[in-house]
Amino acid sequence: MRRHERLIVAAAILGLLTLWEVLARIGRIDATLAPAPATIVESLVRLLGRPEVRASLAVTGGEVLAAFLIAVPTGLLLGFLLAEVPVLGALVRPLVNFLFGVPKSIFLPVFILVFGVSIPQKIAFAVFTTIFVLVLGGIAAVQSVPRELVLVSRVYGASRAQIIREIYLPAMAPILLESARLGMVFNITAVLLCEIYGARDGIGYRIAAWGENLQMPQLYAALVIVAALAVAINEMLRAIETRLGAWRQRA
């Protein structure tokens, strides 16, 4: 996004927040359901100062990280195998495509029955929710590799390790990283869904509790925290993608 475009977006957001603040203060908006932005900011500062809220954020962050570290290598490896082994791909890909299109939330009660309401249940459900987009991303990444370059490399005696390092990885990197970024969105959503639906800790659990008790400033403040963390993670992955893009061009 160009600088002037960022300025326009920032000005639009600031204008909306100012309008929201004014309407809430003069009573045109029900402050019980939509408290003024200044009130939300005050609640945000108070929440970040509470040890139990920071502990809940740490729990959610740990679950998201654990699920991501399991889902990414597993999903991409499965995608690589399905693309490289035609028989396996013919057998498994229809199931992967089917499950990818099914809302994963319908399986949440099954995970609760199997694992109970626990951290392993949340991690397992997040992995299940995330892995399909990574498998499909792995398949697409392998299919993006120029086959003529692979054949020429083999003719000139390149080893399999050299082919993977010099041809496969540079060609696959953009799709793999884009799949990882998209997978993180599924991952965070799955963990929060578990915590809101049934959990004893985590920021999703607290969001559900504040919503049920109509503690709207705390609810909105928590949503701001989650959104900010999600954007930060996405931008971090985007920065990695940009750096690896430069490496890909050199390769």
PLM regions: where:
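Cytoplasmic-entry segments and transmembrane alpha-helices of multi-pass inner-membrane transporters
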Residues: L76-I112, L136-V145, L151
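Loop-to-helix entry region at the N-terminal start of transmembrane alpha-helices
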Residues: A55-E63, L113-L134, L177, Q218-L223
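C-terminal transmembrane helix and the adjacent membrane-cytosol boundary/short C-terminal tail
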Residues: P86, Q143, P174, E178, ...
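Periplasmic/extracellular loop-to-transmembrane helix junction in inner-membrane transport proteins
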Residues: R2-R3, I26-V72
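Glycine-rich helix-loop "coupling/hinge" segments at transmembrane-helix boundaries
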Residues: L113, V142, T189-V226, G245-A251
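Short cytoplasmic-facing helical segments at TM-TM junctions of multi-pass membrane proteins
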Residues: G137-L182, I207
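Transmembrane alpha-helices
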Residues: A124-F128, R160-C194, A221, I233, ...
